Amino acid sequence: MFVDQVKISLKAGDGGNGITAYRREKYVPFGGPAGGDGGKGASVVFEVDEGSRTLLDFRYQRHFKASKGENGQSSNMHGKNAEDLVLKVPPGTIIKNVETDEVLADLVEDGQRAVVAKGGRGGRGNSRFATPRNPAPDFSEKGEPGEELDVSLELKLLADVGLVGFPSVGKSTLLSIVSKAKPKIGAYHFTTIKPNLGVVSAPDQRSFVMADLPGLIEGASDGVGLGHQFLRHVERTKVIVHMIDMSGSEGREPIEDYKVINQELAAYEQRLEDRPQIVVANKMDLPESQDNLILFKEEIGEDVPVIPVSTITRDNIDQLLYAIADKLEEYKDVDFTVEEEESVGINRVLYKHTPSQDKFTILRDDDGAYVVSGNAIERMFKMTDFNSDPAVRRFARQMRSMGIDDALRERGCKNGDIVRILGGEFEFVE
């Protein structure tokens, strides 16, 4: 099983601002307030797409920002709500909060959705604040900021196809030319030290997941060269693509390579001996390869199909992809997977953290200022237009109603002391 993991940043859309406006119509004296509310900001929603296989798209774009709601308008017209930003993910994607490591969602079924970053509420227009004592309020609210957080996406995949063979036979090169994967390729053994995964599409649009596994060596079934770790990955694939360097350029005989790898597979797990296998004769662009291929076919017999290719000139690559897709189609109803011990009995559930809205804390800065923090007070701070004196007075009333003024006095706050909330500074006045 391979884990594809990527970290991304999400920013839900801010709510649109409410506006301060008045009804100005001929023959209608004292028309009253007419400021509309802002629209709701877009949420960031993850949705399962059964056709998606990897998290590759998220490696090219790491930051996602949803749209802001429209501002309110005069004549009590509300701003338009923004459309949610929907991000498609493969089945089996787990979404975690990077900061807390909390599981926010475990998405498994096609079409399943989870709202991970909630869009901000639209600010209220001045019409909303009209009362008998204040029939024409001259302030409005700013839109609520959308949620902002970093999340990690984890996807556990079973590869359909596993590339096996000795080091430097061309497995990584093959994966790089038939998929968008970018495995490390070098002119030395064991360039690949961990499995690489790629989604491959045959010319007829049949697709499958291919894994480039680190090169096996003799003794791998006994753990030599981290053999157990690599063979465990092979155990979970449906089809084995056995690549052989037909040129013998590494000083090994192709037929011996074939026998050794198959012996190691069978020694590790007897069932691997019967796993569907496609033999690929690589490096056919080299002059020695043709003669070696004739001898190789004579040795293994006609029952084992061999597909000659060159990953350098890309000869016969399409034929190989057709053969792999056909073999997968033939064994599509056979389950070769091995259950993970830790996965038994797991219930997949959707988690959603809902922070308390009314608690606050008061701390002291080094310069003696009082620092007030908390979800509710910070939300009100962000939604207050501090360029409007009436809005500032309303904010002060809200602080008193929440008990913040009394709590500051209990902490020793006196007339003229500095109080900080987020980026704002206020002078405490009795």
Swiss-Prot record:
GO molecular function list: GTP binding; GTPase activity; magnesium ion binding
Top-rank taxon:
Bacteria
Any one GO CC term of this protein is:
cytoplasm
Q: Where is the OBG-type G domain?
A: 159-329
Enzyme Commission number: 3.6.5.-
- Where, subcellularly, is it found? Cytoplasm
Q: Name one GO biological process term.
A: ribosome biogenesis
Instruction: Give the matching CDD domains.
Output: Obg (cd01898)
May I ask which residue range the UniProt record assigns to the signal sequence? Answer: none
Note the InterPro entries from the entry: G_OBG (IPR031167), GTP-bd (IPR006073), GTP-bd_Obg/CgtA (IPR014100), GTP-bd_prot_GTP1/OBG_C_sf (IPR036346), GTP1-OBG_CS (IPR006074), GTP1_OBG_dom (IPR006169), GTP1_OBG_dom_sf (IPR036726), OBG_GTPase (IPR045086)
Major location, coarse class? cytoplasm
Q: Membrane-spanning residues where?
A: none
Record: residues binding GTP: 165-172, 190-194, 212-215, 282-285, 310-312
Cofactor list: Mg(2+)
Binding residues for Mg(2+), per the UniProt record?
Answer: S172, T192
Which keywords describe this protein according to UniProt?
Answer: Cytoplasm, GTP-binding, Hydrolase, Magnesium, Metal-binding, Nucleotide-binding
Query: Which residues does the UniProt record annotate as the domain Obg?
Result: 1-158
Q: Where do the record's region annotations for Disordered lie?
A: 118-145
Which residues does the UniProt record annotate as the domain OCT?
A: 352-430
Q: Which family does it belong to?
A: Belongs to the TRAFAC class OBG-HflX-like GTPase superfamily. OBG GTPase family.
- PANTHER family of this UniProt entry? DEVELOPMENTALLY REGULATED GTP-BINDING PROTEIN-RELATED, MITOCHONDRIAL RIBOSOME-ASSOCIATED GTPASE 2
What role does it play?
A: An essential GTPase which binds GTP, GDP and possibly (p)ppGpp with moderate affinity, with high nucleotide exchange rates and a fairly low GTP hydrolysis rate. Plays a role in control of the cell cycle, stress response, ribosome biogenesis and in those bacteria that undergo differentiation, in morphogenesis control.
Q: Subunit composition?
A: Monomer.
Official protein name in the record: GTPase Obg
From what organism does this protein derive? Staphylococcus aureus (strain bovine RF122 / ET3-1)
